[in-house]
Amino acid sequence: MQYSHHCEHLLERLNKQREAGFLCDCTIVIGEFQFKAHRNVLASFSEYFGAIYRSTSENNVFLDQSQVKADGFQKLLEFIYTGTLNLDSWNVKEIHQAADYLKVEEVVTKCKIKMEDFAFIANPSSTEISSITGNIELNQQTCLLTLRDYNNREKSEVSTDLIQANPKQGALAKKSSQTKKKKKAFNSPKTGQNKTVQYPSDILENASVDLFLDANKLPTPVVEQVAQINDNSELELTSVVENTFPAQDIVHTVTVKRKRGKSQPNCALKEHSMSNIASIKSPYEAENSGEELDQRYSKAKPMCNTRGKVFSEASSLRRHMRIHKGVKPYVCHLCGKAFTQCNQLKTHVRTHTGEKPYKCELCDKGFAQKCQLVFHSRMHHGEEKPYKCDVCNLQFATSSNLKIHARKHSGEKPYVCDRCGQRFAQASTLTYHVRRHTGEKPYVCDTCGKAFAVSSSLITHSRKHTGERPFICELCGNSYTDIKNLKKHKTKVHSGADKTPDSSAEDHTLSEQDSIQKSPLSETMDVKPSDTTLPLALPLGTEDHHMLLPVTDTQSPTSDTLLRSTVNGYSEPQLIFLQQLY
């Protein structure tokens, strides 16, 4: 049995992996830009990459910027993974150059056809030129078509200037001496529907619509069109878009003046499609129509087509799109790690230099990021935790912590494992889970070479080499490498001893933390490397930590078990924040 959409599904999954940087085994470097991809996919479509990967096992491939531009390669990469290729007069040359250099023959063929179309538009045949000009030779570069409505209701004849050309090159003008009641409508070849924009005459008194066109790109039907003014004094603008006509080369400049002499601002709109003009439903309604048009375009904000997220500036959208495209132009020169944004690289470099510019005024503790200082102050110096859960009234220091906690109540788990279908509330938890499938252990001890799946395991392990024991019993002074062993010590040795008020309060806090950890919080944790004032020992207990055990049929620890065994002794806000730091 053959599934018809299996190939599309496979390509879609591969593209999502590329955008997330998951299982990408090669990096294409073009100047400052880096593109993650899968070498088997590239080699399947490009003879260039096929030849390279037959002779080398290097992960990084450096391309010549003079031969392959970053924008052109990005479009080419999207075509390879999605089968979609959007060509226009702006990008076709870059895409063709990149495809020709990388030997992607299918794209080369498509680009050549498109370039021939554009060349035909720029240099039409003599037959078509003669049909436009008759016996008049056109050598000028631009042609100004001006359409004026004098709007004289008492006169039966209206003089309308249709075409004004350079007088030195000859007159190219036709005048209509009579008004016609019948309106002409022309079909757009793209939609097959009538495309008409009507402007009420009382709004368009003393109005002018200027169409600036390239004379060499002017098709015959445009000259033959006539602007009609009927008895109702409505100005109807109609246009025909030929298949060979580049609509993006047309700029409409509309100037509207009111009867009382108050002029409206000019609206210059560069259309990507002539049909877009007709898609606006009568923007010139009532006397404030000009303001309505301005508001229509001023309210339009950049939006991500993938997630629907709206941004205040186009530059913010461009930075955001790097996440989906896998573009990481900012590279650390010390370790080679790449980032999508400049501030991410700046923060990362501090892990090499040890710089901690944000200092706590109360305890002189330093932090690499400002958000860490804010969290420290709220957690340890009694500052307000402004983010409160509406369900359980638990308060958090950051909005992201509250958002993660809220998923405990809603049950939302947006992150799905594409291998087994298990769902998670946080991306980092999915990352840990995937490592169970792949066996990846990226955190390696510099002393003995032992590898771990999570950074907290490495931190606890490293204390065996350094002898550090940060967890001290306040009753007897014994110290331990992790808080779990400290709790065991208190239970066995000091369970019957007289407790001081401080120790009783601490035990009460620990018991509260235990009860919190017993709640279903298995997928509400995220771990990122950073600095924190909280103890960074997320204890593993013994060496045979569940995270390091292989998964078998008889023993398959759940993500809840794995994560709970990693962290002990912290309240829920601390757990969430620690997960975000690592």
UniProtKB/Swiss-Prot annotation:
Biased amino acid composition, Basic and acidic residues: 495-511
Signal sequence region: none
Subcellular locations according to the entry: Nucleus
Residues annotated as domain BTB: 24-89
Motif (Nuclear localization signal): 174-190, 257-262
Positions where Phosphoserine occurs in the chain: S289
Gene3D superfamilies referenced in this protein's UniProt entry, alphabetically: Classic Zinc Finger, Potassium Channel Kv1.1, Chain A
Keyword S-adenosyl-L-methionine: no
GO molecular function, one term: RNA polymerase II cis-regulatory region sequence-specific DNA binding
Keywords of the record: DNA-binding, Metal-binding, Nucleus, Phosphoprotein, Repeat, Transcription, Transcription regulation, Zinc, Zinc-finger
Protein name, UniProt field: Myoneurin
Organism: Pongo abelii
Gene assigned in the entry: MYNN
